[in-house]
Amino acid sequence: MAPGSVSSVSSSSFPSRDTSPSGSCGLPGADKPGPSCRRIQAGQRNPTMLHMVLEALKAREARQGTSVVAIKVYIQHKYPTVDTTRFKYLLKQALETGVRRGLLTRPAHSKAKGATGSFKLVPKPKTKKACAPKAGRGAAGAKETGSKKSGLLKKDQVGKATMEKGQKRRAYPCKAATLEMAPKKAKAKPKEVRKAPLKQDKAAGAPLTANGGQKVKRSGSRQEANAHGKTKGEKSKPLASKVQNSVASLAKRKMADMAHTVTVVQGAETVQETKVPTPSQDIGHKVQPIPRVRKAKTPENTQA
């Protein structure tokens, strides 16, 4: 086939392109000049009516609220493409839903109902920001120095940094804990005092007193008694001789007292004689009897 025939077939097989003006859409009556079909189909979407009402209240925020008329004027001025036929109904529904959800309120002492009166936004509750824990000055300084000199630290500096971290992580004991532990250590268990068995004084035989089994103090202590006993034994020997001498002197005195004078008349002369009685048994010294000695009899024959 000739090359010319191919071109003729291809041109006849495919339909010719539409040479209609840009404004036409292939619909009847589309030849009229006007906006393109794409613009009409896509359109400009408006936000919801509730969103527009909230935006109007934020823009015209007042202390006593914003009236419904002011809300309408704001929406129509900013969104001119809103459907005017349904605008009143949509606005009433948006105000009711906003009040039901707690987004809108009426000002105090307001008696209006429906899509009348004025509205205002509900104030949001103020939330207190949680205070972040303040980092210590030493920790912040250590972080800054560590970030700056991380690549330039030597072995000695690395060792120091690890020591600093260990010291910071160390938990220091609280003062209250130390104060509470101190009296516990100071307290010591009292030693059990064993009561000594009660003993009576054998020498005196006196009963014990009520105060802890202590004996009643006497005039002479045991030490004095012991000292007296020692001195008594030492002085007993010279005293024995003195006692004997005193007994002898007493015997002589008694003998002298018992002696009486007897007057004897001998002629013209009178003689006084003193008779001394023999010592009796009640005198201190007893008279020992003289032993009798038998005389040996000699026979007469022997004498001769």
Curated annotation (Swiss-Prot):
Where is the motif Nuclear localization signal annotated in this sequence? 154-170
Compositionally biased region (Basic and acidic residues): 153-166, 189-202, 225-237
What segments bear the compositional bias annotation Polar residues? 270-281
What name does the UniProt record give this protein? Histone H1.8
**Gene name per UniProt:** H1.8
Q: What does this protein do?
A: May play a key role in the control of gene expression during oogenesis and early embryogenesis, presumably through the perturbation of chromatin structure. Essential for meiotic maturation of germinal vesicle-stage oocytes. The somatic type linker histone H1c is rapidly replaced by H1oo in a donor nucleus transplanted into an oocyte. The greater mobility of H1oo as compared to H1c may contribute to this rapid replacement and increased instability of the embryonic chromatin structure. The rapid replacement of H1c with H1oo may play an important role in nuclear remodeling.
Q: Where is this region: Disordered?
A: 1-38, 110-248, 270-304
Give all residue intervals belonging to the H15 domain: 45-123
Which superkingdom is the protein from? Eukaryota
- From start to end residue, where is composition biased (Low complexity)? 1-24, 132-144
| Record-stated family | Belongs to the histone H1/H5 family.
UniProt keyword Cytoplasm present: yes
Naturally occurring in which organism (per UniProt): Mus musculus
Q: Where in the cell is it found?
A: Cytoplasm; Nucleus; Chromosome
